[in-house]
Amino acid sequence: MKALSLFSITLSFVALTSVAQQRDFSKVEIKVVPVAKNISMLEGSGGNIGVSVGTDGILIVDDQFAPLAEKIEAALHQLNPGKLKFVLNTHHHGDHTGGNANFGAKDATIIAQSNVRKRLASDANSKKEALPVITFDQSASVYFNGEEIKLLHHGPGHTDGDSVIQFAGANVVHMGDLFFNGAFPFIDLKSGGSIDGYIKTVAEVLEKIPADAKVIPGHGKLGTVEDLKTFHAMLVETTGLVKKDIAAGKSLADLKAAGLPEKFKDYGTGFIKTDRWIETIYNSMQNK
């Protein structure tokens, strides 16, 4: 049952990604959301993109799906006519790295945690230009547009290659898929993700960032530190409830039948429904 449940989650995610890649991207509009100082967020289809513009040029965090590359370039040009110099990947999923090949072919330097390159390179369909050319294990810094931009790997969380991106001068943090604002997150257990690691990473970020920082989520609206705290509290409480029921000998079917408290209902209206979230926690616990 454990293997079947994990397979089902993985298969569902792959299927959803495939459908997304086949959709009509001509109808997608790229929206520019001002964040702070020279930092913006681009919303379109896929993971939110962080943007730094300035005298050094343009740096982006993630690049959504490949068919959106031209629209992303147009949005970037509206912000700054300079050259795109860097692409920072928060992890390897296609809705965050799909534009890599396009931007890499135009001489943007792609940087990511070591496991991101390994996972992208393991895909026979990956182009050389799509692969990160600079990788790191724990941390790296890019000094660009007058500030230090930190890439920090806290260990397994959403995947085994997550990076939290901190724009130190602008007081902005891009969480990648370590933050789904207002929704249950997808945790890729097959790619080294871990519910305990996910919670640990969010807690560590909250300990370090200023209370007035702006927080760019992987999915959802631009957030605040309070939003991230609320998200973390949800993670801790729902995981605790499932762990308690597992310890009491309840099955996955029992857990799904019981559900979660009503206050978490709205979290299950996104990609990950309540049953899927319970199953994710359950499978993560079984994998320990």
Enumerate the language-model features and the residues they cover.
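Active-site metal-binding motif and surrounding structural segment of the metallo-beta-lactamase
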Residues: V32, T55-L59, P67-T109
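Metallo-beta-lactamase
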Residues: E29, P34-V35, G57-I58, F65-P67, N115-G161, A168-G169, ...
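Solvent-exposed loop/turn segments at secondary-structure junctions
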Residues: S45-I49, I58-I60, F65-L68, H91-T97, ...
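Conserved beta-strand hairpin/beta-sheet module of binuclear metal-dependent hydrolase folds
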Residues: I30-A74, I165-F167, V172-M175
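Bacterial N-terminal signal peptides
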Residues: S5-T17
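Divalent metal-coordination and catalytic microenvironments
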Residues: N38, S52, D62, L76, ...
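Accessory terminal helices/loops
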Residues: V14-Q22, E207-K208, D212, K221-K288
